[in-house]
C-alpha cells in the first residue's frame, strides 16, 4: 500500500522526529522513502550543505532499517525551490506518493496552532493521500522496541468517518498489530435556549458544567448503546474476516476529542487513525475541532485520511 513515503523536512531537529516512524513503516512495507527539502530561492549558494545533511540522514535511515528488516529499502533525496505548501502538493500529485509523514511542529512553521494557517493544515486538507503527523515530544516519551504496536480507530457512525477503515486495516495488516474500534456515545445536554444538543456537535463547556452534565446524564440510553454496539460489531466482524485482531470500546461523553485522547492513554495506543470528514464534514473534524484538538493535546501519532484519499 505504501510504496512511496514522503518525508518533508526543514532540516530542524524537530522535523527529524519522523525518521524512526518512517523507518519502521518502510521496513515493514518495503517502501521507498523520499527525503524532501524545500529551500528558499536565495539559499542556492549553500544547497550543497543541504544535500550533505540529507545524504547523512539517508545513510542513517538505511542502517537503522537493516537492523529490523530483511531487505533494505530505497531512500531518495529531493531538493526543491519555492514554498513548502505548493512544492509538497506538486510532488505528491506528480510522483504517486502514497503517504506523507511529517512533524506537527518544527522551527519553520510546520505546526498546528490555535489557527490552522500552516503548512500542516494546507497539506492535510489538500493532498489526496493519508498524512501521518508526529509530535516531537512523542519520540522522547516512548521506550518501546517497536513504535507501532496497536492502533486506535475512532468512528462516529457516519459513512465519512468510515473512510479511515480501509487504511487502518492495511496498516494493521502490514504491521501485524491489533485494532481498537472506539465510539463515544453522546450525552445530550441543555443549551442556553433550553433545547438539547448532542455531544458530537462539539461545543466548548467549562469543567463545572461538564461535571453537572455528566452527573445528570450518567447513563447512556439503552437503545442508543445497543445501536452503537451493533455498528461496532459489524465493523469488527469485517476486520476479523480479513485476519485483523480487533476489539471495541464505547464510552459516553460530550467532548469527542477529550474521549479519544483519554482512551488512547488508557490503552497506550501507538497510532490513531481518523478521517478528516466527521459527522459535520471537513470543517468540523479538521478546522478547529476534533482532529486538531486530538493532535494539539494528545501525544499519539495521528494518521489523517482526507476524503480525497479514500
Regions found by a protein language model. Name each.
Residues 7-8, 21, 25, 33-35, ...:
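Short, structured motif recognition centered on aromatic/hydrophobic residues
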Residues 258-262, 277-285, 293-302, 306-310:
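Protein-protein interaction modules outside structured cores
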Residues 24, 36-60, 184-230:
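Acidic, proline/glycine-rich short linear motifs
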Amino acid at each position: 500500500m505504501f510504496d512511496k513515503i514522503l518525508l518533508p523536512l526543514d532540516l530542524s531537529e524537530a522535523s527529524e522526529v519522523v525518521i524512526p516512524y518512517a523507518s519502521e513503516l518502510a521496513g515493514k512495507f518495503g517502501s521507498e522513502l523520499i527525503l524532501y527539502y524545500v529551500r528558499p530561492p536565495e539559499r542556492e549558494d549553500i544547497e550543497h550543505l543541504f544535500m550533505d545533511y540529507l545524504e547523512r540522514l539517508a545513510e542513517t535511515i538505511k542502517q537503522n532499517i537493516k537492523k529490523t528488516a530483511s531487505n533494505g529499502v530505497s531512500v531518495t533525496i529531493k531538493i526543491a525551490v519555492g514554498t513548502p505548501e505548493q512544492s509538497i502538493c506538486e510532488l505528491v500529485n506528480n510522483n504517486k506518493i502514497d503517504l506523507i509523514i511529517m512533524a506537527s511542529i518544527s522551527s519553520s512553521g510546520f505546526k498546528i496552532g490555535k489557527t490552522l494557517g500552516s503548512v500542516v493544515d494546507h497539506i492535510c486538507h489538500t493532498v489526496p493521500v493519508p498524512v501521518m503527523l508526529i509530535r516531537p515530544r512523542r519520540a522522547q516519551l516512548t521506550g518501546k522496541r517497536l513504535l507501532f504496536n496497536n492502533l486506535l480507530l475512532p468512528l462516529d457512525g457516519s459513512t465519512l468517518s468510515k473512510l479511515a477503515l480501509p487504511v487502518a486495516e492495511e496498516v494493521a495488516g502490514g504491521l501485524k498489530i491489533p485494532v481498537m474500534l472506539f465510539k463515544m456515545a453522546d450525552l445530550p445536554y441543555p443549551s442556553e435556549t433550553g433545547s438539547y444538543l448532542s455531544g458530537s456537535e462539539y461545543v466548548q463547556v467549562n469543567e463545572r458544567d461538564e461535571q453537572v452534565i455528566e452527573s445528570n446524564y450518567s447513563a447512556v440510553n439503552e437503545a442508543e448503546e445497543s445501536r452503537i454496539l451493533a455498528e461496532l460489531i459489524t465493523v469488527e466482524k469485517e476486520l476479523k474476516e480479513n485476519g485483523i485482531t480487533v476489539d471495541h470500546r464505547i464510552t459516553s461523553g460530550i467532548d469527542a476529542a477529550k474521549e479519544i485522547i483519554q482512551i488512547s492513554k488508557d490503552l497506550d495506543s501507538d497510532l490513531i487513525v481518523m478521517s478528516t470528514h466527521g459527522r459535520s464534514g471537513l470543517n468540523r473534524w479538521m478546522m478547529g475541532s476534533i482532529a486538531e484538538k486530538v493532535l494539539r493535546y494528545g501525544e499519539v501519532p495521528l494518521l489523517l485520511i482526507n476524503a480525497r484519499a479514500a
